[in-house]
């Protein structure tokens, strides 16, 4: 039976009452962030983590980051709480090592939503989870499942695996 992640989220939000817990949101770009921020900002203190070493070339990485930076002040009237942004250094070697491209060069030619993407989702989500845990965030999530180009089912499975790693959150 498929999970209703929207129902689970709604139940979580209802259980929060007036509390606004901290949430680390891994974001891939501004467009995918907009709905998530609008929906969740009323209920959480959100910090965005822009960690995307998979984006190539570096100019595209920087363009997406700049779009996110430019987007946040324009979007402020629609959000309920101030959003923080954490930027990471561009390091594509981390990505190549994580997906093991040297051992599996065929991954470079896989279509969207294939094994390379699954490894990429896992890598970035693990980094976000680790950051959230190290910095005492109460929750973490990603915008990746919002994108029509990504495999939401794989992303949700990976999210559940991370959730099961620790009973103490994030």
What is the predicted role of each segment?
Residues 1-35, 43-170:
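Nucleotide-activated chemistry modules centered on ATP-dependent adenylation/adenylyltransferase
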Residues 40:
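Aromatic pocket-lining residues of Rossmann-like dinucleotide-binding sites
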């Amino acid at each position: 039976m498929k999970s209703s992640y929207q129902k689970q989220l709604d139940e979580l939000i209802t259980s929060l009452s007036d509390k606004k817990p901290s949430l680390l949101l891994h974001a891939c770009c501004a467009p995918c962030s907009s709905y998530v921020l609008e929906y969740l900002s009323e209920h959480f203190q959100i910090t965005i983590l822009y960690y995307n070493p998979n984006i190539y070339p570096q100019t595209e990485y920087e363009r997406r980051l700049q779009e996110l930076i430019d987007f946040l002040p324009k979007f402020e009237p629609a959000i309920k709480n101030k959003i923080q942004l954490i930027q990471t250094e561009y390091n594509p070697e981390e990505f190549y090592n994580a997906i093991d491209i040297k051992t599996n060069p065929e991954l470079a030619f896989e279509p969207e939503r294939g094994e390379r993407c699954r490894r990429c989702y896992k890598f970035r989500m693990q980094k976000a989870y680790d950051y959230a845990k190290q910095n005492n965030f109460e929750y973490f999530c990603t915008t990746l499942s919002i994108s029509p180009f990504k495999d939401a089912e794989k992303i949700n499975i990976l999210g559940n695996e991370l959730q099961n790693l620790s009973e103490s959150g994030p």
